[in-house]
């Protein structure tokens, strides 16, 4: 699947989401932060480097497993988190970051987030540095018990710290469990 196809898919999902929100005005109330939500443990499974570069011989898609501890809103509407991920190629990434919940009604939550941390590539994609940055978002459905099920899309790169900076994209299914 090429970058153009992925971009078109993301645009289509965005258009469908906007059409759905427009069709359901009661759900279109947007609020920032989730102050009543407790801390959560999030577990994810998906794919690492879904668009491997043809210019790097070691770049290939791998399975990814992720675990995060997400603190409740701490700085107004901003919630910190700590996490780690591993891939089937032996890569490991330990990171810390910040996210902001954007609530579309009581159930749908979009969480843009950014993180930074230490990366060990294993035998997989060479990202060019031991220090990597991750940006992305998660769209999740919040259940009555405050657990969430969603999809996360992230881009990880060294932001130009080194000459080699191919970056990678990940897509994961995430389930988060409230700690109450």
Question: Model-predicted segments: where are they?
Answer:
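Cleavable N-terminal export/targeting peptides
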Residues: 1-36, 180
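Repeated loop/turn-to-beta-strand initiation elements of outer-membrane beta-barrel proteins
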Residues: 41, 73-78, 106-110, 145-151
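Solvent-exposed loop/turn segments connecting transmembrane beta-strands
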Residues: 50-63, 84-95, 106, 122-130, ...
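Membrane-embedded beta-strands of outer-membrane beta-barrel proteins
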Residues: 65-69, 96-98, 137, 173-175
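Residue-level signature of outer-membrane beta-barrel architecture
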Residues: 69-73, 100-102, 141, 155, ...
